[in-house]
């Protein structure tokens, strides 16, 4: 009986989890920019090679500083302070977008652009520049 109950709970949990709420990982066709969208929390992209210089690392950042940008539920895009790295997923072809929850990211030859569709805040990230709005 316990195993039947456990199976029922697992199946119910899987049925309740919709693809729209799951995190989705993807990267630019060049693989220089790697991103994740967590539907209710944030869109974040990390970059491997860049020609721009980030602002000075704040004393409040204990992790790696400005290896990418992110936009959350509120406020404009910001530089990342993290202890992990985004990796995995499939290439998002140039000219295509991916959406999860309130976030949309668009892959362009000029870089990746991610926006919170409700607040219209976000960021643009490329080898040449990092822009927050």
Each model region followed by its residue ranges:
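A low-complexity, Ser/Thr/Gly/Pro-enriched, surface-exposed linker/loop concept
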Residues: 42-92, 125-133
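Bacterial N-terminal signal peptides
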Residues: 6-15
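Extracellular/lumenal glycan-associated surfaces
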Residues: 30-48, 68, 99-117
């Amino acid at each position: 009986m316990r195993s039947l109950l456990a199976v029922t709970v697992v199946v119910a949990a899987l049925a309740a989890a919709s693809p729209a709420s799951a995190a989705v990982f993807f990267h630019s066709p060049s693989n220089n920019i790697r991103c994740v969208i967590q539907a209710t929390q944030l869109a974040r992209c990390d970059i491997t090679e860049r020609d721009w210089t980030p602002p000075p690392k704040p004393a409040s950042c204990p992790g790696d500083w400005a290896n990418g940008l992110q936009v959350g539920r509120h406020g404009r895009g910001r530089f990342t302070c993290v202890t992990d790295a985004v990796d995995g997923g499939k290439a998002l072809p140039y000219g295509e977008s991916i959406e999860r929850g309130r976030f949309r990211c668009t892959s362009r030859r000029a870089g990746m652009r991610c926006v919170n569709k409700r607040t219209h805040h976000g960021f643009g990230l490329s080898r040449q520049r990092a822009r927050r709005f």
